[in-house]
């Protein structure tokens, strides 16, 4: 199973865990596995069309999956996924 590192903003949705193990042959399958096990993460990770929410960045072994094959990027048993929500804000 791949390791999925959970950012602080999502930890309440996964019982406070900092990382999880999840199975899947692709990034999409691994993230869907996380969402099936922890339903509160689904709307935080996925848009209504099934793609990643635009403000969620996912890295596979330090490579942005968007420059790889996106949700179709292959994942191996010893790989690590990092979920990193984009931050925005500031004074108007």
Can you say where each PLM-predicted feature lies in the sequence?
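Ubiquitin-like/PB1-type beta-grasp interaction modules and other compact soluble beta-rich domains
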Residues: 1-92
